[in-house]
Every structure is written in structure tokens, then in C-alpha cells.
Amino acid sequence: MAKTKAAAAKSEQKICVEGARVHNLKNVDVEIPRNSLTVITGLSGSGKSSLAFDTIYAEGQRRYIETFSAYARNFLGNMERPDVDKITGLSPVISIEQKTTNKNPRSTVGTTTEIYDFLRLLYARTAEAYSYISGEKMVRYTEEQIIGLLLSEYLGKRIILLAPLVKNRKGHYKELFENIRRKGYLYARIDGEMQEIVPEMKLDRYRNHSIEVVIDRLQVQDKDDKRLVQSVAIAMKQGEGEMLVCEMDTNEVRHYSKHLMCPTSGISYRDPAPHDFSFNSPQGACPRCKGLGFVHIIDRNKVIPDPTLSLKDGGFAPLGKAKQAMIFWQVEAVLEEYGCSIDTPLGEVPDEAIDEILEGSPERLRIPADKSKTTNDVYTEFGGLVKYIEQMRDADVGVAAQRWAEQFSGICECPECKSQRLRKESLHFLLDGKNIAEVSALELDQLYEWLEGLDKRISKRQQAIAAEITKEIKTRLKFLLDVGLDYLSLSRPSMSLSGGESQRIRLATQIGSQLVGVLYILDEPSIGLHQRDNIKLIRSLKALRDAGNTVLVVEHDREMMENADYIVDIGPLAGRRGGEVVFQGTYKEMLKKDTLTSKYLKGELSIDPPAEYRKGSGLSLTIRGASGHNLKNIDVEIPLGKLICITGVSGSGKSSLISETLYPILSKHFYRSLAEPLPYRAIEGLENIDKVIDVDQSPLGRTPRSNPATYTDVFTDIRKLFVELPEARIRGYKPGRFSFNVKGGRCETCGGNGYRTIEMNFLPDVFVPCEECRGKRYNRETLEVRFRGKSIADVLDMTINQAVEFFQNQPTILNKIKVLQEVGLGYIKLGQPSNTLSGGESQRVKLAAELARKDTGRTLYILDEPTTGLHFEDIRVLLEVLGKLVNKGNTIIVIEHNPDIIRSADWIIEMGPGGGHRGGEILYCGVPKESLLA
């Protein structure tokens, strides 16, 4: 009995997975020590994510959801049980993936980490209010204080006490005046002038008015003046806590309020609450931009993209070519007013005429009867093209119309809040001379320093209130600084973060939550990190482990493996030839084994730098004066015909320079893209390249119907081959017959999916093979057409390696699929759904498609972090592929920290020296140096 208990206790020290068969896993058994830092490594496509996320995490989440009632599960959705025999010792599990899922423009680093919530509380409780009109500090008074001030300032003087009822609002206020008369008041100060309130009195309803009722006229006597005390009380009640005093001899007016009030202008603020500092709350958001910080405006350059065209030829892009319609007649009428016609190129039309066409005509336009097909001339008002487009954009006329209008829109800074997102009242609450938007815009390390010294710069009352709040903010900030995110700010939009940054923010949030006994699963957290920042990350993961948690990391980073307590190596290769546990144990034990990973770690296999760096074409592309984000007005020369690596610490400006400045410039030039580049002065050398291609790791398509065969276009050639077969020709089949996306050849029972979805109310949806086609996707007649004994469905089910052998005598098809084999994807199937491919696999499919194309050798390729998800061996294959593209005369720019990529590049551009405001400079340009790898 004692032995059984001891064995059970020992097994509880491990997470045991038995018989895992998800995706390509081959009935694997794995033991992961609890309270350890464990790394799962292996080739791309070997089954790492299948084990970590699709087995362990999926089972943990499924068990959690099982704890809810059947009724609750109906709304939450149920997770399918992973294909595994048994998992024991499983703790509550939290997955921290590298996907940037938040596309909400309202989400920021501050809202995601909840630090901004504490900052809002700090400002609501300790900030001091200032007037947005006079800049003076706001004051508030009790009735006793007001009486004291009146006795000291107006003693012996004649004054009028007024209660404000209306402040700068439109209306005729007839009912208000009647109500005032019924209360016995006979005079009011209306728009600055004293007037008697007469029966049936009303004002111009379309003008703004200010109305203050006269409560009393009196001469201020000594401190026992009971009339003064009584009148002040009535004025404060009628004015809802506010009153005005007008000195009768000078007409000078002063404001008094029990609320926050400007003593000069009289404006008042309500008492601040945390929601007044939230740009996601109606109480705090800027009324113009609704808290977004930007507004949409119509871009004239998009409305008139080519000034050499006339109205007749479609010079105004929203209108297209001239046709019989009222808006064309209106534009033509404006042109004729200025002596132009529908044939005049818009570049030759006077600016005044263009302004009138865009902004609207001040006078009614005459449309001749012969055009409008009426008996008399028509006189019409013309609001302008800008108003026309805005109406289409803002009206509820359907998505297509709104998209049409948005193509002529641009985004610009909100003119009211200057991108600070909050209403002006909220922006005039200051703490240590800064408003909350200015504090949110500080980089995180600067914010930490500001909070550190805040105690010395605020009053004792503020210190007492702020102590606990600032302590909590600093604790959370420290976690963000520890994972190398010191260059971010709380105001940074979440949608602008890279996958690695998003993941590290979530990691810091989890460390801050101080949970214990949790299993954390992370997907390559070292992405986007310079070697310097990687040490901070490892330290944070160890802190998570030391707090009593189990940390499971899918990773290829050598340094991470060296610091791990336990390593699980999945292999031996990828796809069908992977899915096995080739090693599990400590790092030292791994070095004694003979796996592909251990050979790289021991140095038996390595990625050697080229013996000679490419000389390139001698031509270059130069950006001058790049100054977006933290770029410091830099000039960068990019030599063409080389493999170029852009490196530097996180936040140094690499993506700002390449992805947000260079790529949009080139995309706009070659493809008329609407994406606006960050500010720059000039670009030189555009004539030296023909096109630009951004090869990222996003999925090949949006649906499972997309696959490597369709993406590389080899499926078109395969369908053409099947159409030429005798059986297909006899039956009169066309290429569409062999597509599973259109009616005709596909199985209509499952719509060409190969499976049917059965909805289960209280259980997850079940996917069962289609009983009609048995998962083949096509109908029986289509499958009867065979090439060398194989149907179109059999071909799609082949791996790339099998397809290369099968199509040996079909050069058109062979050339395209051979490239997929060369980039190391021989194990995937031709028809494998794109949503089952990893990011690294998707990127290599895209590279293969590029390699297969006939190109001019003058293409510029941009790859951001291409080693994401790649093993040492995958990186070696990737470098071979990139080398082939460069050897054709193309140029490749890679944003990367991986030492093997840096060593293998022909040219290095290092940015820094730090992140954020300390970055944005070019530190080094030239061939790789060992100093860069330190």
C-alpha cells in the first residue's frame, strides 16, 4: 500500500502523455517534469506544436470546459478530445502563443497589461485640474468660503447674485422663462446683457445662448449679513452648485462653484473618476475621434490620382468615366464657370475650380434642360465630391459601398485631441506637470524612472493616496522591462505589435498575476529578440518556474536549450517522417545522443558562412531622410544583388525602416498601393528593380481549400493534364471538372470538402468523412478519369516526394513541385489544407512559388524574421533557397537576429544602439563582422 502511494506521488511529479496520435504524432509517450523549464524542439513540421498545443494544451482546456454545466457549454463551445490514450499530472494550463490576435484600434499596451487602469485611478485620485481656457488652476468653494470671499472682496459694494441655468446652448427657452417667472424672478442676464423676463419671452432657437437668473441685488454688509447668506444659498441651489457675482459699478463678473471651476472663465469640471481618463468610455473619449486618436479624411491625391486626365476620361477617380448622371452635370457646370470643359486635363483646371468641385459650390448650379431632359433648366445645390464620398462611407448602404468610399480616404491626426484620444477636460488634469496622455507616451523605462522620483515632486496628501497605486504600476512595469520591452509605451496600439512582442506582453502579465501550480505553454518566445534581450527573457521564464509553475516552451534557440531543465526532441525529420520522440532528458544527456538537433548543438553539423561574399550588381537603392517613429532622419544605401540582413536590438527601428517605410514606398510605386509609408525625404534607384515581394509567414489562404498545389499554381497544370487524357476528352471534361471548388466535378454532398460537419448541441462539432465520396472530394464520374492509375484525388493525397517521382516525365508540373522538394517540404501533401501548415512551412511554400517563376532577376524580396519556427536544419535549407534567388540576380532583405543568418549574409545593416528613443540610428553597414554576433 505504501509503495503504491509513493509511486502515485512520484508520478504526480511528472506530466505523463501516453499514446498521442494528433496529426503526425506516432503514438508517442512523453514525460515532462513538473515545476521545470522544458523545451520541445525539432524540425519544422516534426510535430512539436501537435504535442504541446494540440495535445497537452487542448486536453487541459477541454477538462476546464468540462467543469461547466451543459447549459454553459452550449454557449462556450466544446473542445474536441485530442487523439491521445491518457494524460496524467496535468495542471491548469495557460497558452501564450505568438499570434497577434488583437486588431482592435482601441487596444493598447496599457489596456492589455491593465497598467493603464491603475494610471487612470492615479490621475482620478491625485491629479490637479487646470482650465483649458486660461491655464489657471481650478478651484472649488463651500458656501461658507464663498461668503467669506464676498465679505473680503465686495464689502460695501453693490453686487448682483446670479445662478447659471443655460451655458452656451441652442434653443428658444420659452418654457424656462415661464418657469423662472413662476418662481418670482423678474430679471436674467442673457448672453451678457441684463433683461427683464416678460410673458411669452423666447430667444432665437438656432443660436447658442447663456442664461443666468438674477437671484438678488444687494450691498454687502458686515459678517452678520443674513440676506447675503440666504441669497448665496438660493443661488447655489438654483445654479446646481455654481453662481456668478457681478459688481454693479464695474460690470465685472466672477465665478464661484462647489465643483472644480476656473476663477477667470467660469468653466467647471465634474469631479474626476477613472472613466474620465478612459478613451474607451464616452465620459473620457475625445468627442471628435471617439477616442481613436485619428480621423478619416478624404485624400485629394486619391480622388485625383492622375492630373493629366480630364473629367471625360475619368480624372476624378470616384466618378469614373463621364456618363449621364446628375453629379457629372454638376461637376461640368463648375468647370464651365471657370472656362473649362469636360475635355480639359484636371492639371490645367484652376485650383479654385478644383476646390469648388471637391468642397461644394456656394451658389446653386444651373443644369441646362437639354442635359437634364426636362422642359426647364434645373437649379441644384452641389455639396462637392468630398461630401458625396463621406455620405457613402458613413451611410448604412452596405459593405461594398463603404469599401469603395474608404479607398479615397486617408487617416490623419485628430485635430481636436492631437492623437491624445481624450477630451480636453481630461487632458488638463496634471500630475507633476504631465497629463495622462503624456505619461502614457513615455517609453516604459522612462515611465518607470518618472514613477520612481514622483514622491519627491508631489504633496504629502498626494503621496499618501498614490503610494499603493504607484507600487502596483511599478511592479507590472518591472515585468515588462525584464522581458526586453523597455522601448514600448503604454499608448502603443496592440495591432502594431509583432507576434513576439504580443507574446512577451502576455508573458509579463502572467508573471505579474503571481499564479502558482500552472502549466504555461509558450510558442517560441525568443522571436524578435536580439541575443542581449534573450538573457532577460530566460531569466523571466525561470522566475515563472521558481514561483512553482511548469513552463513548457516550443523553441529552437540554443541559449534557451542550454538553460532548460529538460529537453524533448521530436523527429527524426518532418511530416510523415517525424512525429516520434527521438530524445527526452537534460541538455548534458542530449549532447551524448546522436540526433539531428544534438549534432548542431555539438558542432558536428553547422551552417558555415560563405567562403566569399557576393559582389552584387553594383547598383543600389537609397532611402534618404527616413524619420518615422524613432528613425533619426537616416540615409540608408541598400546594395542590390545581395542577401542583406537588417539586425539590431528589439525596438531599434528595423521594421520601421523596412516594413513601414521601404516596402510601402515600393508597393505604392509598383502596385499603386494605398498604404502610406512613414515620413522620408527621398528614394533613389527605383529604376534598378522591377518589383517588390513581401514573403511573410501568414497562411497561404483564408480557408482550408487553399493548399500548396493551388498556391504554386501547379494544380492548374495537373488539371490540364487530366483534361488531355482520352477518357476526359471523350466525356468532354473541361479543367473546371477537376476543381473541388466549383460545381460539376466535386462531390455536392460535402461541397468538395471531403467531410461533413455534424452539429452536437452539448458536444463539439463532429467532422465525419463524407459518406458519398469517402473523403475524396470528387464525384464518382470525375474519379474514373485516371493518369497512370491515379485519380485527381489520389494525386492531391501524394506527398511532394511521391509527386516528384510520379510526374517525372511531365516537365511543366515537375519543375514546380521539385522546387517544393528543394525547400525542404517533401513531406507535406500536395493537397494539404493551408491552415494545417506552420508559419515556417507557409513561408517556404511562398518562396518555392517565387523560385518556380520566370523572373527578371531584378526583384526585391523582404522577409521579416524568416527563422521563426525553424530548426537549425530548416535554417540551412532556407539559406540555400535564399541563395538561389540571389544568384539569379535578385535582392533579399532579411530582418533577423539569428547568428547563422547574419554570418551568411553578404551585407549587414545594424541598427541601434538601443530600443525606442535610444535607437533609430545606423551603427554599421558592410560585410558581417564577428563583433556583431557578440
Identify the residue ranges that each predicted region occupies:
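Conserved phosphate-binding elements of NTP-dependent enzyme cores
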Residues: M1-A934
